Structures are given as C-alpha cells and as structure tokens.
C-alpha cells in the first residue's frame, strides 16, 4: 500500500473514532437531567398549579413554587421506564406549549394504551407529548456498540506501534545497501540496442554464456571472471552496455552507484558493501553492477584527506568481499569508470577485476551503426545517408550521436517537416559541435569586422600550412555559445595520433587570428586569449611530454607536478629537474610558439588579397564552408545570395531624430487614452 493510502486510512479511522466517542458521550446525556418519579411529579404539579393560578382558578403561587413551575416548562423530553414486568419502554417527547405552531393539546400514542399517572399529569400540565416504543437491539448490535470504540483504540495503537517500529528500522537502515534489483519490466535493453562497441559486446557475451551454461567452460578447468571493469571516455556506452547485460543475462541484476556507499555516518559505506554482497550470495548466480566506481575505489594514500577516511574503509571492505577469506562463487561484479588512472592498484589486480574491457569512441563503422540504432523511430528522408553523417562526425561518442539525432528531429519539427533530411542533420551537427546560434545578439560593425578578419586569419592559415592538418569545415561570424566567431576544422578520418608537423601547423593556425588583426586593423584584442592559451599548452606538451624538441630531447618533465592532490594520492613532490633545465624548457616553448607566429605572419602577408576576400565574404554571408573559402582564395565569387544582416549597435544609435519622431509611439503619453488607431505600414 502506498504511503498516501496509509495516510488516508489513518485519518478516516481517527475521524470515525471521534464521531463514535462524541455520539457515546452526547447520546441521551446532552442537556439531560435525571429525576426520580416523586420529584418529577412535584414539578408537573407545580406546572399545573401555575396554569390554574394564571386562569384564576387557583391560589397564587409562591416564588419557590413558581420557580418549580418554570423549571417544569423547560422539560424537553421524558423517558418512562415501566415496571420490570412490562416489556415496553416508552419515550415521551414534548414539543412545547404552543411553540413552533404545534397544537398544545396534540397527543400521539404510538405503542399501546398507556394511561398512567405520568400521562395524566402531562396532560393536565398542558404539555404536548409523543409516546414511542424504544426499539430493542440484538445481541450483536449491543456487542458491537459496546466494543467498537475499544477495537478502534486497539487498532490505532497497533498502527502507531508499527509506524514507530518502521521509523526505528529506517533509523538503523543506513547500513543497508541501496542496490536496486532490475526486473524484466524495467525498460529492457538488449545487445541489439548497442552498436559501435563490438569487441566489448563479445567480452560480456562470454560472461553471459558462462552464466547460462557454466559446464561448457568449467569442464576444461576454467573459471568465470570475478570482476569486469569497463573503461572508456564519457558517453561511449558503458552504462548502456551494463543495461544490455541485465536484459540478456537472465539472472538477478543488482545496480548501484559508487556514490551510494558513503554517507555522513562513519562505517556506513563498509556496512553497505557487506549487505550488497550478502544479497548477491542469496541470489547467486547474479550480477552486481557498480557505476562510477571511481567515487569509492580511488587510490589509497595520504593526499590532503589523511591516511584513513570513510572512503578508504569502504574500499577496504570492497577488496575483502571481492577476493578475501570467503569466496563469492556465482557473484560477478561489473564496474564502469571513465577515470581508471585514479583507481587503487589492489582493486585492479587479477582475482578482483580479472577482465578489463575498453569501451572507446566508435570508428566510422561504429558511428554508422549507432546512428542506425538511434534513427529507428525517426522518419528519415530518402536523401539521408547515415554513412555520410558518420564520416562528418569523427570523434563523436555514442552520447554525442544520440544528441545529434535528437537535435535534428527537433529542428525538423520546428520547421514543420514530416521527415528529417540532411539539412536538419547538418544544422544539428553545427549546433552540437559549435553551440547554438545567438542571432539576436547585437554586435557593432567594428566588432563584427574584427571577428571577420580574426576568423579569416585562422581559415587562411589552415588552407596554406599544408596537408598535415585537418581541413577547414566551416567558418562563421555568427555568435555561438561564448564565442563571437568559430573556425571549425574537421578531420576526414579518425585520428588516433598526430605528428610533430601536425602540432606545429596547429600552433600556426591558432596564431593566424591574432596576426590578421595586427596586419589589417593594427591592433591587438582579447579575442585571441583562448588561442594563445591553447598554443602555449600544445607547445609545452611537445617539449615536456612528447619529446618533440631537439634541444630537450626525448625526456619527460611533466610527471613531477602532474598528479592531482584530491584523487587520494600523495602530495606532489617538487619539480624533478633543475632551474637551468626549467629555463631551457621555457625557452624552447617560447621558441616554438614564436617560430610558428612568424611563419603564420609570412603566410598572411604574402596572401593579403586572399585574406581580404575571405573577410569580406564572412561579412557578406556570415558563414562559409571549405569550398567557399577555396573559391574566394582563387578570386572567384559565390553564387548564393548574401545574408541580410540585422541592424548593428552602431546603426541603432545613429537613427535620425526626425525618423524617431515619425515612429508611432508604443504607449500613449500619460493622461491620454491612446484610442487612436495605429498607422498602417507603408
């Protein structure tokens, strides 16, 4: 029963109990007074004497006697209990003498002929009455009425005791595992819904085959892996692969996040680990999936958190449960992380995580398969080629491709289309890769011109540096995200590594934007800040990590200060090289960046006309692709119409006063009704 239903039932019981208690207290006792027969007859006789005195047929009454008569006139009801030998019980109710429009002499006799003394006295007192027989109740009715309040009180007491016990259980349930047992009815995912990670699928399918037919593997002395660690960048499908395992395994599947172990109380994490594996043993064979295990499995050590903390205690218990003194046969632990470098070495040793599955970003064939999975429920135009889209999205993860398909469907719906076409996918790709357009942003002509030359410098240098670079895909001066302009380079194939020449060309391209501003506008702006940061970082890694400097040689000088303190490792030590070496490293970084800066300068100076044409093309069309830039560099013209840009900030501020006065007012002046009709547009 849901909590809301319990609350409604509780309130209903309380209301019913209060009504019963009120009826028992008020029934027959509210405003009633018990009189014996003698006293009652005295009151009625005083009432009779008062009536006779008022009619002039009797003596005047004393004050005490008149008070008794007045009291008799206030009688509301009379209950007459006859002799025990009489089987009838009579209830007499009077309506008042002449009140409420009733006849004072009205008499109603419902049960038999009862002409006793009380009736005669009531008649003489002028009280209109009604005689009814009291209904006799059965034994069960009497028992129910007498015991019902007690039963209700007992039920409420029992209910509150249960609530208190449940509350106490919740207070002591911090050590219980929060793992959720997945059922067949919860969004079942199979391996048909997973694409682009064929090797990883083969690895986990073998584990599922072992669970379904263990004798096939144990007959040769093999054993099932105790743990499987899935590693890969964010969005590559590690959790989706785990959900597919849950849908295919046919055994109990417990799912929990690494952050669900540690709470504010000491010892809770270790207790939850013990409870999790106890549940697994009871349901063996089963699978336990821990998502984001780096939250609890980080490297043990000093760091800034001390040598012992709650996370370390939880990790120790996890290590013992996975491969400790007691065996956990039939319990397979599957974990996922995108930070395998921070995991404790004891967690990664054989016997705990025997198998490590790499879930990389998909290649061309994998991206095509992922697009096919995500477009099953999307109506596509006949011109849509998923392989073409996959070729244009190198480096995209599965989550990126799902977002691309969703954005394309939303764009097509916004344009009132019945099917999604290639134009929608192209716009969606630009939105995912470069950010959403901010066309409503008003930019001055000066800022727009600066942005155009900046992006033209990037694009032109990318065209001139040679083949060892990514080709220009699109250049735009439409503000996207936090940038005023974007130059997008898109590789034609998956790039797993690059050469020294590629890195140098990358630095030259980054410097092209600042150089174009200097050559044409004779100024330096803050727009090149991000380019300079990326160029410096790339040059530093060339010198200190990749051994691409002839002066420094193939040595690594980056590991000394590279460790991150808050990952639980030891505090980073001082730099493992001398001040002289540090100066040589800094000088080599400066030389690499400066050389490429001068190289890009020569390219732009020798191709100044091409730079002007590309910049003018950006100002006219706002967005250019690689073919457009080739056409402009060769002196050609684009055949498509120019974009009609919105008024800039300068144009907005230079409106004539006469034109401003001629505009109709949006609101009427104060004190006027403003009922005149708006002027029709010319």
UniProtKB/Swiss-Prot annotation:
A Gene Ontology molecular function term of the record: metalloendopeptidase activity
Cofactor comment: Binds 1 zinc ion per subunit.
Residue ranges annotated as Cytoplasmic topological domain: 1-7, 160-682
Binding site for ATP: 232-239
Pfam families: AAA, AAA_lid_3, Peptidase_M41
GO biological process: protein catabolic process; proteolysis
Keywords, in A-Z order: ATP-binding, Cell inner membrane, Cell membrane, Hydrolase, Membrane, Metal-binding, Metalloprotease, Nucleotide-binding, Protease, Transmembrane, Transmembrane helix, Zinc
Cofactor(s) the protein requires to work: Zn(2+)
Protein topology in the membrane: Multi-pass membrane protein
Subcellular locations according to the entry: Cell inner membrane
Enzymatic class: hydrolase
Major location category of this protein: membrane
Positions of region (Disordered): 638-682
EC number: 3.4.24.-
Main function: Acts as a processive, ATP-dependent zinc metallopeptidase for both cytoplasmic and membrane proteins. Plays a role in the quality control of integral membrane proteins.
Subunit structure: Homohexamer.
UniProt-recorded name of the protein: ATP-dependent zinc metalloprotease FtsH
Source organism phylogeny: Bacteria, Pseudomonadati, Myxococcota, Polyangia, Haliangiales
